[in-house]
C-alpha cells in the first residue's frame, strides 16, 4: 500500500517489526505465554496473515482453549490467496475480524493498496465478498480504512461498512497502534 513503510522503514511507534524469519506456530504460542494477560491477541502484520493460515488456526485454537480472545486483521484477500473460503475454518477460533477496506471503489483501492497485477481489477469486490461471508462465520466483523488517503470518500467507506454490510466501521490513522 502507498502508506506502508514495510520495505523502507519497518517501524511502528518505535517498534521494529521486521523479522529475520517467520516464526513457527510453537514460537508464536510460546511468546504469548498466557493469553488471558491481554485484552486480545491480534494476528496482524506487515503483509497478510492469512498467507500462514495454518499457523493462525493452530495458535488461535490454543489461545481460545486457554480462555483468550482472538482478532484477525486482514486485507480480505484470504479466500483468493488460499483458493477457498477460509472463513468456516476460522469459526470458533476468531472472535473478531477487521478487514482493511481502505477505499470506496475498486479503482481507488488498486491505486492505494497496489495489489499484485493478477489481483487488480477485481480484488476490491472479493474483499467485499469476504466481509459479507465473514458475517456468517465470525461473531464480530469490522471494516477499516487508513484515513487521509487521496481520492477516498471516507463517508462513503463508512456507509459501505454500516449501511451496505451492517458491520462496524473503524477509521484509523497510519502509524497509530491500537
Where are these regions (language model features)?
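N-terminal pre-catalytic segment of deacetylase/amide-hydrolase enzymes
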Residues: 22-23, 27, 33-36
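Conserved AdoMet/S-adenosylmethionine-binding subsite of the radical SAM
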Residues: 29-33, 46-178
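Canonical Radical SAM [4Fe-4S] cluster-binding loop centered on the CxxxCxxC motif
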Residues: 1-24
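Active-site groove signature of glycoside hydrolases
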Residues: 38-48
Amino acid at each position: 500500500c502507498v502508506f506502508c513503510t514495510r520495505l523502507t522503514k519497518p517501524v511502528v511507534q518505535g517498534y521494529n517489526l521486521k523479522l529475520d524469519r517467520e516464526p513457527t506456530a510453537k514460537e508464536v504460542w510460546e511468546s504469548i505465554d498466557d493469553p488471558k494477560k491481554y485484552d486480545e491477541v491480534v494476528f496482524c502484520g506487515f503483509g497478510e496473515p492469512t498467507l500462514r493460515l495454518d499457523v493462525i488456526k493452530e495458535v488461535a485454537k490454543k489461545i481460545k482453549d486457554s480462555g483468550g480472545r482472538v482478532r484477525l486483521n486482514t486485507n480480505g484477500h484470504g479466500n483468493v490467496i488460499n483458493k477457498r473460503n477460509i472463513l468456516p475454518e476460522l469459526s470458533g477460533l476468531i472472535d473478531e475480524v477487521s478487514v482493511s477496506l481502505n477505499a470506496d471503489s475498486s479503482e481507488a483501492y488498486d491505486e492505494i493498496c497496489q495489489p499484485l497485477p493478477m489481483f487488480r481489477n477485481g480484488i476490491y469486490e472479493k474483499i467485499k465478498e469476504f466481509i459479507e461471508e465473514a458475517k456468517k462465520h465470525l461473531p464480530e466483523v469490522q471494516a477499516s480504512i487508513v484515513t487521509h488517503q487521496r481520492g477516498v470518500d471516507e463517508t462513503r467507506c463508512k456507509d459501505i461498512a454500516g449501511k451496505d454490510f451492517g458491520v462496524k466501521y473503524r477509521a484509523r490513522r497510519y502509524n497509530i497502534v491500537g
